[in-house]
Amino acid sequence: MLSLLPLWAQALEVGERLTPWTLLDQFDQAFTLENQTQTLLVARSMDAAKLVGAALQDQPKGYLEARHAVFVADIQRMPRLIAKMFAVPAMRDYSYRVMLDRDGRVAPRYPGAVDKVLWLQLKDGQLVEQHEYATAAQLREALEKALP
């Protein structure tokens, strides 16, 4: 029971302001979470990241940005050599930016299932609501509803 205490302590509450952070994307370009961000997508595993990729398949470049959405991928468990030599270079072909949490500084702030994509809906930097998506179809539908 005590082992669950850290998860409870980290749980986000509606109305809570998200602490700003800065991560590098797959092009080593910095991104800082700001009040303009309306949707934060968090993937804690390769399977969850693949859901995002499938949901964004065939979408034009700038699709997430037009929706004021940001995608964070937790890649801390990926061996650094694999990330550097193969995974991150492959991500450069994506039509969307991926904020890479290489050291687990950001994704653990937002508790959720490892195999699902966490959707945090924000307004002026505060959490309005959150959802988890287990399929690419569900995530795609939600993104389509988040019209620019």
Regions found by a protein language model. Give the residues of each.
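A short, polar/charged loop-to-alpha-helix boundary motif
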Residues: A136-P148
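Short active-site neighborhood of thiol/selenol oxidoreductases, capturing the structured segment around
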Residues: T32-K50
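Thiol/disulfide oxidoreductase modules built on the thioredoxin-like
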Residues: E34-N35, R102-Q138
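A short beta-strand-turn-helix
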Residues: P20-T37
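Short, internal strand/loop/helix patches
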Residues: V70-V72, A87-V114
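Boundary at the C-terminal end of the N-terminal hydrophobic targeting segment
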Residues: L7-A11
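Bacterial N-terminal signal peptides
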Residues: M1-P6
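Structural microenvironment flanking redox-active thiols in thiol-disulfide oxidoreductases
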Residues: A48-A90
